[in-house]
Each structure stands twice: as structure tokens, then as C-alpha cells.
Amino acid sequence: MSKRDYYEVLGVAKTASESELKVAFRKLAMVHHPDRNPGDKEAEIKFKEVNEAYQCLSDGEKRAAYDRFGHAAFSQGGAGGPGFGNEFGDFMSDIFENFFGDGRGAPGGGRGRGGAPGRERGADLRYNLEISLEEAFSGKTETIRIPTSIACEACSGTGAKAGSKPRTCSTCGGYGRVRAAQGFFAIERTCPNCHGRGEVVDDPCTACSGAGRVNRERTLSINVPAGVDDGLRIRLAGEGESGLRGGPSGDLYVFLSIKPHPFFQRDGADLFCRVPISMVTAALSGEITVPVIDGSQTQVRIPAGTQTAKQFRIKGKGMPVLRSREVGDLYIQVSVETPQNLTKRQRELLQEFDQSASDENHPESAGFFSKVRDFFVSGATRA
């Protein structure tokens, strides 16, 4: 059976650079790897084909021979077929270690080739903090208490009882990973005995039960700057769980949420407030007093003939912009309130007004009903 062209197998041009070959190979190897296609014979064949093509084209001398003679260069009596040495195994191990292990490579546990047991970074923590809109306006310092874990002082984070120490894992030789043969190919997996640490604790510390960490509650002060918005995340570096074996601590992420306000709605740095006004004030004009987010009050002049939903802008009375000197605006939207529970005299006065009113007093409604009449008249004419 004839072999496919190696360039065709990798899906690259004959002028492809070394980096282009490597990218194509990694992509195809991921797709056809036997561990990702268990029991799929076709995938296994394609995987071997991809490996063979890359081994040839990634070697300068073999590629030159292949470009000149094709597959005949590696037939019996030729230059020799592409091999799969230890260097290739190490290279492929680097590619697949994050896919077929448990993620204990960098920056966490495990150990490098020939190195000491790796440091393990502490876990990140999350804290949800709810504040008021006024606190978001002015900023504040909040003291919080968080449950976390710190390095055990009794064993200095090793997990071993005082006077003893962890021993090198006999299963993986302290490497933290073991190799499993997959046909002609070797795949690395996290060691099932030491779980990637490279060490085993035979006599665990009684204070932490061999975990190397103990649970504690910590008190922290969080600076909430003025102008924060709902959903903002504050990162406190190194304030998460302690690392193991000298590893760095994780981070603490504080997620802010802002309580609903009884008066104000927020849109970015701008605030909106709906204020009811009397029918008389709307008709004759007047002044109303409205609240401001800083706790003060301000006056708004209502002109005669103001309608519901009319909006008034008060510049510079909104929220501060985070890490800026800019400030948003306050928008007052009025709602004309229809009077209720009228006395006899009040009803009489309104009836007198209605009898004396003309379309000039209600231009919007007069215009609307005029359009309605025109609509029906034109409809009747067409019929």
C-alpha cells in the first residue's frame, strides 16, 4: 500500500518552516491521540502516520532526502526510516502532560526532570461583599473575616510528624509522574501513589493530619474606592490559601454587589430619581426639593406646563468615576400626580376649570383626538 505524502499528512506546504511543521503536528496529534479516541483503530493509524511524517520533516537531513527521493529514500537500502527516540518521547510528554494528567504541572505540584518535589501554589479564594450605593459613592474600608488555610506550623507545611520527613515516592522515583506505554508511544500520567507530589508521608503530622495546612479564620481590611460599580472584582494578591512546600499563596478575589436604593437608579456614573409633583405645581410652576446621593438636598425649578416624564439634569451630582476626577450627573424625572380623595368643593373647582378650558389648555390631547377623528373619517371615505 502506497504511503501518503508527508506534507499532505500534516497539511502544510513543502516550503513550511520548522515552526509551521510543529504547530501542524501538535494540532493533529491532539485530534488523533489514542487516549482521546479509545478503541478507534482509524484514529490510531492516523496518529502513527502523523508521527512518522513529523519525525521525517522535522529532521533537516531526513527532510532533504525525502524532498529529493520521496519515500524511496527510507526504503530498504536507503537512508533509513524515521525513528522515534527518547528525545521524541520527552517532546510528546510535554505536549500531553496537561491533557492526560491532573493539571499538577506548572505552577503547582509535581517535580521537574531530575529536580526536587515541586512547590504547590495555594488556592484562590472568593469573598462576596455587599455595600450600599452611598458607600459606593464615598468609598470605604471594610473589615472582613474569611475562612482559609495556612501552612501548618508544627510540620512547617511538610505534612510529616516532627522528627520525621517525607520519603521519595517509590512508584515514580520522586518524579511525580509515571509513564504508561501506548504501543510504541509513552504517555506520562500523574503518579497514583503520591498524587504528583513526588513524596509520601509515612508518619503524618497530628496537627494537620498530613495535609501540611490547617484551617484558620483571618481578618483583613479591604479598601473599597469611591465610584465602584456592581460586579466589580478586587484582587488581593497573596491573601488566598497558603502554598505547600514553599509554594506561593493564592489570591483573594472580592466581588462587590450594590444594594438596591430606595430613590436612585444608577447607569454608569449617572443617577436617576423619579419625583412626584402636584398637578398645580406642574400647571403653574414652582420649586421642588430633591435628595442628592451625598446626603444633601437641592432645589429644582419646575416651569409652568410641565408634563409627566419631563427630565431635569443636575450636573455633577451623580457618582464619581472610578480612579478619575470626573463625576456623573443626577437626572430628575417628574411624575404629575392626579389628586385623589377630593372634597366636594375641590370637585366643583375642577369641574369649573374643565368647563372653561379649551384645546389651548390641552394641546397634546387635542392634537391626539384630532388625529383619531381624521383616521376614522378617512377610513369611512375609503370604504
Swiss-Prot record:
A zinc finger (CR-type) spans 139-217. Residues 5-70 form the J domain. Its cofactor is Zn(2+). It is found in: Cytoplasm. The keyword Zinc applies. It holds the Pfam family DnaJ_C. GO terms for cellular component: cytoplasm. GO terms for biological process: chaperone cofactor-dependent protein refolding; DNA replication; protein refolding; response to heat. Binds 2 Zn(2+) ions per monomer. InterPro entries: DnaJ, DnaJ_C, DnaJ_domain, DnaJ_domain_CS, HSP40/DnaJ_pept-bd, HSP_DnaJ_Cys-rich_dom, HSP_DnaJ_Cys-rich_dom_sf, J_dom_sf. Zn(2+) 2 binds at C169, C172, C191, C194. Its main location: cytoplasm. CXXCXGXG motif repeats lie at residues 152-159, 169-176, 191-198, 205-212. The J domain is necessary and sufficient to stimulate DnaK ATPase activity. Zinc center 1 plays an important role in the autonomous, DnaK-independent chaperone activity of DnaJ. Zinc center 2 is essential for interaction with DnaK and for DnaJ activity. This is Chaperone protein DnaJ. The gene is dnaJ.
